[in-house]
Regions:
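C-terminal beta-strand-loop-alpha-helix "lid" module of Rossmann-like NAD(P)-dependent dehydrogenases
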Residues: 1-292
Length: 292
């Protein structure tokens, strides 16, 4: 097979790959917009729920043994991490950075509750801290999935299986960068649930809690927590799509550069082949004339 034909086949192969990377970029862009829109649709509700909790907390009597606030076993806490990875790869170092961050902060006796197939597969046969029966998808976060995860987390804390639960996920810092972060889910910290200064549109007067503050708090605290989890899942999903867009954009640009270089090489090879053919034709014609 001629050199020019091989070059042409390579160019066509890279062009096909470039179509795939460009399509993946567009798909991730669409998913990113939808995820952000979904979160914007529900975030006012969870913001209002947080405001409501902050108005209830000051009325709670001190009850250090309550599972939502009690910091048990401070010397050697039974700690779990809710780890939000992706279901798919081809997103640059998105999953690797998150798992590296997790290993740097986790202790040998901690437990990993992993969301996303990439993280689950990476830890399944390599890390005994993975809770294998805990399996959830990271694709297209939903309120129901966040609610189910919240119920599991609260049950494990109430039953005494765990003392602390943290969420580990990737947070978008700006349009170009994102980094892994860790936030505590349970026990709740009263310092971060204090009421903000009242604005002009805020309700005035004392809050009446029926039948009592603890009963009201226990009803709305799980909603607040599943809002935290849904927000982290959505933020993580958006960071994944952003990372994949960056990776696919870089791959598409690299493919363009390769095609340009190969096209130049193909043109030189083709030009040399044509020149050689012309030379052979001229030489053959001269030989015929000499014979005649």
């Amino acid at each position: 097979m001629s050199s020019s034909k091989l070059l042409k086949e390579r160019i066509e192969s890279i062009q096909d790959t470039m179509k795939i990377t460009n399509a993946m970029y567009l798909i991730s862009s669409s998913k990113l917009r939808k995820a952000r829109q979904n979160y914007q649709n529900v975030s006012p509700y969870f913001n209002r729920m947080r405001d409501t909790i902050s108005r209830v907390v000051p009325h709670l009597p001190e009850e250090p043994e309550h599972p939502f606030f009690h910091e048990r076993n401070l010397e050697n806490p039974r700690r779990a991490y809710l780890v939000l990875t992706a279901d798919k790869g081809m997103a640059g170092a998105y999953n690797q950075n998150l798992l590296k961050f997790l290993r740097e902060h986790a202790d040998p006796n901690d437990r990993f509750y992993v969301i996303g197939q990439v993280g689950y597969r990476a830890l399944r046969h390599r890390d005994p801290r993975l809770v294998e029966e805990f399996r959830y998808s990271a694709t297209a976060p939903t309120l129901q999935r966040a609610r189910d995860i919240t119920v599991d987390a609260i049950d494990d804390c109430k039953s005494g299986k765990l003392d602390e639960i943290y969420i580990v996920y990737t947070k978008i810092q700006n349009a170009l960068t994102s980094e892994p972060v860790m936030e505590r889910l349970l026990p709740l910290d009263r310092r971060f649930l204090q009421p903000a200064p009242k604005g002009l549109g805020d309700p005035k007067g004392e809050v009446e809690l029926v039948p009592d503050a603890w009963t009201v708090f226990e009803q709305i605290a799980p909603i607040y927590m599943h809002g935290m989890i849904f927000g982290a899942m959505t933020e993580s999903f958006c960071a994944e799509q952003s990372a994949r867009m960056t990776a696919m954009d870089s791959a598409t640009k690299s493919a363009n550069d390769m095609i340009r270089d190969l096209q130049l090489e193909y043109n030189r090879t083709r030009q040399g082949s044509i020149t050689q053919e012309i030379t052979e034709i001229i030489g053959g014609a001269a030989a015929v004339q000499d014979r005649s």
